[in-house]
């Protein structure tokens, strides 16, 4: 027991005996850590510092307790270190956040166009069902703007071509696409040619023109027959059996085409494509089509005549290009056997979808059988009970050729009137003047007869000769 007080008395002298450098070593790192924020110290150094600080802070009587068991000094020194360790992390987070913001700002110009494009797509209306079901039709509309720009013309069959929201425009593009069996490239080529042709030909103006009655009178008609469902059946009639002169009608091919186009445009107008409110079912029935009848009664010249062949070939080329999918059916009535060459020519220029609509009928009186609902309206000539085409149909404007001016003949007529008025006076004067002469001549003749009775026989002989020569002269004339 006597030894213990000695040990306890010596303990307070230890701190004083400590060199001052130890105190500076403990305080200097704290200052440097707060300013420079060094890396965390090793665990061994931390324990040494904890021991020294514990000795300095604790009173002398508590020195007997193990320094490790004192919990209060250690947290006091560790708390700043934890904060010091967390501070760099927080700063790095802030710097990363700032860097990310700067990167976002740098990326914003590139992202803005994408965002705008996405907004535009969202704002666009949903694609119509007829385009969604038919990708080829959608592609065709994608090309329409370029087609109209290249041709410089936007009118087709009385319809101004617009976009895919316009029903009449949709129906026209469907017709061109169906005529080419869904091939967008071929449909585009045909539409381009048709627009260019209409720009040059101006078919709408041709319907207002006037055409020779001698050349085209009685050759073409258009009829409208109302049906029970409220619709109308449009029929064009071409009666080539009424041709008066082959050379006059077919010799001028351009003139013939213009007349034929004018008649076709009248029929197309009655289809009322511009008033359409329903899109045609691509795979279904097309209500905007007409019937055509070609009558070849008494026609026996089509196989050999080159003039008619040229006109027919040109007509087929123009109509197959400019008027696709406008025919429901086409009937060739009163067709002679020699017309086979014409059907062969048509198959060359027209698609199978078109040629299957052609129906030759040898007897025109059987035509009405093809349309039982229209029998009462069809002309009697074609097996119906209706009026004739001349009475019931309409056609292009026809005019008769004006007679040639007869100005040179009018002057002689006036002179002849004056001569006729003066003739009686002159004749009366002549008769009065010649009367004495004639009386003298008659008296002389009577005297001659009495004096020369034998001269009569030669005169009779001369009369007989002239009578025999008359037929020969007449035949010679």
UniProtKB/Swiss-Prot annotation:
GO terms for biological process: Golgi to plasma membrane protein transport; regulation of exocytosis. Residues 80-124, 402-450 have a biased composition (Basic and acidic residues). It catalyses: a 1,2-diacyl-sn-glycero-3-phospho-(1D-myo-inositol)(in) = a 1,2-diacyl-sn-glycero-3-phospho-(1D-myo-inositol)(out). The keyword Transcription does not apply. Its main location: cytoplasm. The keyword Metal-binding applies. One of its GO terms (molecular function) is metal ion binding. It is a peripheral membrane protein. Gene3D superfamilies: CRAL-TRIO lipid binding domain. PROSITE patterns: CRAL_TRIO. Its cofactor is heme b. Residues 7-38, 49-67, 451-477 have a biased composition (Low complexity). Residues 1-127, 402-477 are annotated as: Disordered. Residues 215-390 form the CRAL-TRIO domain. GO terms for cellular component: cortical endoplasmic reticulum; cytosol; endoplasmic reticulum membrane; plasma membrane. CDD domains: SEC14. Heme binds at residues 240, 260, 294, 296, 330. It is found in: Cytoplasm; Endoplasmic reticulum membrane; Microsome membrane. Keywords: Cytoplasm, Endoplasmic reticulum, Heme, Iron, Lipid transport, Membrane, Metal-binding, Microsome, Transport. It holds the Pfam family CRAL_TRIO. Belongs to the SFH5 family. Non-classical phosphatidylinositol (PtdIns) transfer protein (PITP), which exhibits PtdIns-binding/transfer activity in the absence of detectable PtdCho-binding/transfer activity. Regulates PtdIns(4,5)P2 homeostasis at the plasma membrane. Heme-binding protein that may play a role in organic oxidant-induced stress responses. This is Phosphatidylinositol transfer protein sfh5. The lineage of its organism: Eukaryota, Fungi, Dikarya, Ascomycota, Pezizomycotina. The gene is sfh5.
């Amino acid at each position: 027991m006597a030894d213990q007080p000695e040990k306890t008395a010596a303990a307070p002298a230890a701190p004083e005996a400590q060199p001052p450098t130890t105190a500076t070593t403990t305080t200097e790192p704290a200052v440097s850590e707060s300013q420079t924020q060094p890396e965390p110290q090793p665990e061994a150094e931390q324990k040494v510092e904890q021991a020294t600080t514990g000795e300095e802070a604790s009173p002398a009587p508590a020195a007997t307790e193990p320094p490790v068991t004192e919990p209060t000094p250690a947290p006091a020194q560790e708390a700043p270190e934890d904060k010091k360790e967390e501070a760099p992390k927080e700063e790095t987070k802030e710097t990363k956040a700032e860097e990310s913001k700067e990167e976002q700002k740098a990326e914003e110009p590139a992202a803005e166009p994408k965002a705008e494009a996405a907004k535009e797509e969202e704002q666009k209306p949903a694609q119509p069902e007829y385009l969604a079901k038919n990708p080829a039709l959608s592609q065709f509309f994608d090309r329409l703007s370029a087609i109209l720009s290249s041709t410089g013309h936007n009118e087709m069959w009385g319809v101004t071509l617009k976009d895919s929201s316009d029903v009449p425009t949709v129906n026209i593009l469907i017709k061109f696409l169906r005529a080419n069996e869904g091939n967008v490239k071929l449909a585009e080529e045909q539409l381009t040619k048709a627009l260019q042709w209409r720009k040059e030909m101006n078919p709408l103006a041709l319907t207002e023109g006037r055409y020779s009655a001698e050349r085209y009178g009685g050759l073409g008609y258009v009829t409208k027959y109302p049906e029970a469902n409220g619709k109308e059946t449009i029929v064009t009639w071409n009666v080539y059996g009424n041709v008066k002169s082959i050379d006059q009608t077919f010799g001028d091919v351009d003139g013939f085409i213009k007349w034929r186009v004018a008649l076709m445009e009248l029929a197309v107008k009655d289809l009322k494509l511009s008033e359409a409110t329903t899109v045609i079912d691509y795979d279904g029935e097309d209500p905007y089509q007409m019937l055509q009848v070609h009558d070849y009664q008494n026609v026996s010249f089509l196989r050999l005549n080159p003039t008619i062949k040229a006109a027919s070939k040109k007509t087929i080329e123009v109509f197959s290009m400019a008027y696709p999918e406008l025919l429901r059916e086409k009937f060739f009535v009163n067709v002679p056997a020699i017309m086979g060459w014409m059907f062969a020519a048509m198959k060359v220029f027209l698609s199978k979808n078109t040629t299957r609509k052609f129906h030759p009928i040898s007897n025109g009186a059987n035509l009405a059988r093809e349309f039982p609902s229209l029998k009462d309206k069809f002309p009697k000539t074609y097996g119906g009970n209706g009026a004739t085409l001349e009475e019931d149909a309409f056609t292009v404007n026809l005019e008769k050729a004006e007679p040639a001016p007869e100005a040179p003949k009018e002057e002689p007529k006036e002179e002849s009137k004056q001569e006729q008025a003066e003739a009686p006076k002159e004749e009366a004067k002549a008769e009065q003047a010649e009367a004495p002469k004639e009386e003298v001549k008659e008296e002389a003749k009577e005297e001659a007869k009495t004096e020369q009775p034998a001269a009569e026989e030669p005169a009779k002989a001369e009369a007989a000769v002239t009578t025999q020569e008359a037929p020969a002269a007449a035949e010679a004339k």
